[in-house]
């Protein structure tokens, strides 16, 4: 059975495909997840994350942007966007504890992105989680 980390990794891959212009990914996501041995509760978890990010993508991007400092969101790589969007969605819209989310995103960054990406992800998601702790989403 897949772990939540593996489910999140698969969601990152789906979000990456979506960001790269693959609109069909929304329709085939369940079968792609099952091919990766993500089933039952983890399948439901992964689909809820994927669909949640897509449903709130504009709101998520607006949450991330102020924390980028000298970066332009449009210039970020597709993988970085995918990981940030997943992390921001979980921080803002799920009950999972923020340190767990941030750690998972850092680990996914180590697997899927450039060597400096985990530090970047940590800084952005930590800043976002602190802001939302002061002023939660309504």
From Swiss-Prot:
Keyword Transcription regulation set for record: yes
Protein name according to UniProt: Transcription antitermination protein NusB
Swiss-Prot/TrEMBL keywords: RNA-binding, Transcription, Transcription antitermination, Transcription regulation
InterPro entries, per database record: NusB-like_sf, NusB_fam, NusB_RsmB_TIM44
Entry annotated with the keyword rRNA-binding: no
Organism for this UniProt entry: Helicobacter acinonychis (strain Sheeba)
Protein family (similarity comment): Belongs to the NusB family.
Reported function: Involved in transcription antitermination. Required for transcription of ribosomal RNA (rRNA) genes. Binds specifically to the boxA antiterminator sequence of the ribosomal RNA (rrn) operons.
Listed CDD domains: Terminator_NusB (cd00619)
One term of GO molecular function: RNA binding
Single GO biological process annotation from the record: DNA-templated transcription termination
Any Pfam family matching the protein: NusB
GO CC terms: cytosol
């Amino acid at each position: 059975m897949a772990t939540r980390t593996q489910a999140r990794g698969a969601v990152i891959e789906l979000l990456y495909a979506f960001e790269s212009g693959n609109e069909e990914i929304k329709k085939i996501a369940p079968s792609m997840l099952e091919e990766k041995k993500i089933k039952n509760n983890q399948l439901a978890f992964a689909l809820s994350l994927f669909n949640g990010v897509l449903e709130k993508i504009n709101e998520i991007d607006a949450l991330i942007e102020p924390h980028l400092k000298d970066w332009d969101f449009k210039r970020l790589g597709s993988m970085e966007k995918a990981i940030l969007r997943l992390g921001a969605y979980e921080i803002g819209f799920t009950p999972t504890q923020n340190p767990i989310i941030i750690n998972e995103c850092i680990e996914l960054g180590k697997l899927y992105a450039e060597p400096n990406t985990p530090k970047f992800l940590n800084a952005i998601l930590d800043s976002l989680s602190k802001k939302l702790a002061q002023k939660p989403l309504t």
